Amino acid sequence: MSVGLVLVSHSRDLAEGLREVLEGLPGAGVPLAVAAGGPDGELGTSALAIAGAVESLGAGGGVVILADLGSGVLSAETALEQLDPSLRDRVHLADAPFVEGAVAAVRAAAAGADVSAVLAAAEATRGVRKLG
């Protein structure tokens, strides 16, 4: 079973744009869910929406959550507390840049990596430089 990814952002447009990029990567097809923005289209995050996104992917091969900003991380941590323990044990919150981490995670998941390796791939992008 493939590892799924949940994209947590304060902006639905930002998260949906990232999902579009990820779905366009060669060999993609990784299960993706978005938990972004407020219920009326405003900026924000919701622990309830994040928990729902995780549950929509199911336990499968595990789930990695990537968040755009610090308060998104706090919402994700709250969401984890709300999950059934049997699911929570298979869900991991990545300490990674939102875009670069998501790209690395999708590539690893598409290659068949397990949830620990997908998480490690995302977190390995923390020090990636864009310029020499």
What are these regions (language model features)?
Residues 1-132:
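N-terminal loops that bind phosphate or other acidic moieties
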